[in-house]
Amino acid sequence: MKSIEVHTDGSCLGNPGPGGWAALLRYNGREKELAGGEAVSTNNRMELMAAIMALETLTEPCEIVLHTDSQYVRQGITEWMPGWVRRNWKTAGGDPVKNRELWERLHAATQRHRIDWRWVKGHNGDPDNERVDVLARNQATAQRDGRATS
C-alpha cells in the first residue's frame, strides 16, 4: 500500500462568499497540487472539498497522513460522523447536519484508505500549510474577480 502525505486548506472571502480549496499530495518525492473554487461557498465547505478532492484523486488504496488546519473536518470525520450516521444525519441536538452531502462524499472517499487525520495550527509557519493556504486563497480571489478556471 502506498504511503501518501496530504495537506489541505480552504478559504472563503466572506462567509459565505467566493471560496477556494487546495490540496498538496506527496508520494515518493513527487508532488501534485490540486485547487478549485466556487463562486459562493463557506469556509467549512471549502475545507471539506479540499479533503474530498485529494482523496478522490487517488486511484488505489493508500495509507495517508492528511494534515488539515480545520478542526471541523478533523473532528467531523474522526469523532462526530458515527453519531450522525446513527441518528440519520442529525446532530446530538437533533438538527440536520450542515453540509451533509459533502460529509457523505468525504465518508465515501475514505473507505478504501487508511487515514491518519492530523490537525495543524493554521497560519503558524508550517510551510506545507502555508503553501495550500496561498493556493486556496488564490482560488477564492479568482472566483471573486471572475477569472476562475475551475
Curated annotation (Swiss-Prot):
Residue intervals of the RNase H type-1 domain: 1-141
MF terms (GO), sorted A to Z: magnesium ion binding; nucleic acid binding; RNA-DNA hybrid ribonuclease activity
Primary location recorded for the protein, binned into one broad class: cytoplasm
Positions annotated to bind Mg(2+) 1: 9, 47, 69
Location in or out of the cell: Cytoplasm
Reactions catalysed according to its record: Endonucleolytic cleavage to 5'-phosphomonoester
Cofactors, names only: Mg(2+)
Keyword list, A-Z: Cytoplasm, Endonuclease, Hydrolase, Magnesium, Metal-binding, Nuclease
Cellular-component GO terms for this entry: cytoplasm
Enzyme class label: hydrolase
InterPro entries: RNase_H, RNaseH-like_sf, RNaseH_domain, RNaseH_sf, RNaseHI
EC number(s) reported in the record: 3.1.26.4
GO biological process: DNA replication, removal of RNA primer
Signal sequence residues: none
Binding site for Mg(2+) 2: 9, 133
Stated family: Belongs to the RNase H family.
Subunit structure: Monomer.
HAMAP family, per database record: RNase_H
This protein's name: Ribonuclease H
Source species: Xanthomonas oryzae pv. oryzae (strain KACC10331 / KXO85)
Gene: rnhA
